Amino acid sequence: MGQVMLVTVLLPTRHRTHLVERTVRSLLDLANDPAQIEIAVAYDEDDTESHDYFTSTSWVTLVADYGAELQVHKTPAWGYQDLHNYYNLLAGRAQGKWLLVWNDDALMKSAGWDTMVKQEQDYMGMLHMITENYRPKFALFPLIPQKWVDLFGSVSLSNSNDSWIHHICLEANAIKLIDAVVFHDRADLTGNNLDQTYLNRTNQKKLYKSESMRQIRHEWAQRLIEYRTQL
């Protein structure tokens, strides 16, 4: 284990290297201290485009020029139905005190967003950044402490990772709003990035809403409540 960072950005991707470069630049350009940011990428083992990019000098140099940390993982092609597998793998290797559940089609809009996280770095719960173009009251890109993974063993058990975290923290009354703003450049919201990666998304809402999954989320919320009362 290396240096402890402030934030690890959890970033799974497939066939979208141009979006990865854009989103990473948005995060690091607007960070007050990019040297405290770790970019953690996961890509599928059959994704040759990503393999070529993430093993290139241009990618390594892009991150290094900001002084940020970097890790890249080639994974099984789990697919969107098991999106949580990517986040869980990355979280298990993250060096950040905080974990940002991020997408390659997201853009950071707020300067000093990392300072906002640092100001709340001892909070045990979810930090909520506003998504300016979609459901601002819902945490589409949640920040959770590494202690979350210590407590539960994973980020999420559902490919609806944002909903999983948000609903648990909502029940536990463990949500804190910060002033950072994100733009989600998703195909159904903006008309952009209507590619095969987007089209291959599979809806798991029925499973997410099942009684068994509801019960697990409730149990996690109760464990979070108990943990917070001991602080």
Residue ranges and their predicted role:
Residues S163-L231:
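C-terminal catalytic/acceptor-binding lobe
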Residues A35-T48, H73-A77:
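Short beta-strand/loop segment that forms part of the nucleotide-sugar
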Residues G125-F141:
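Short beta-strand-to-loop element that shapes/binds the nucleotide-sugar donor at the catalytic cleft/hinge
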Residues A111-M126:
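Conserved donor-nucleotide/metal-binding helix-loop-beta segment in metal-dependent transferases, i.e.
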Residues R25-Q36:
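Short, acidic, metal-binding catalytic loop of nucleotide-sugar glycosyltransferases
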Residues V41-W59, L107:
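A conserved acidic beta->alpha catalytic loop
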Residues G96-L107:
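Short beta-strand-to-loop acidic/aromatic patch adjacent to the donor-nucleotide binding site
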Residues Y87-W98:
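Active-site nucleotide-sugar/metal-binding loop of Leloir-type enzymes
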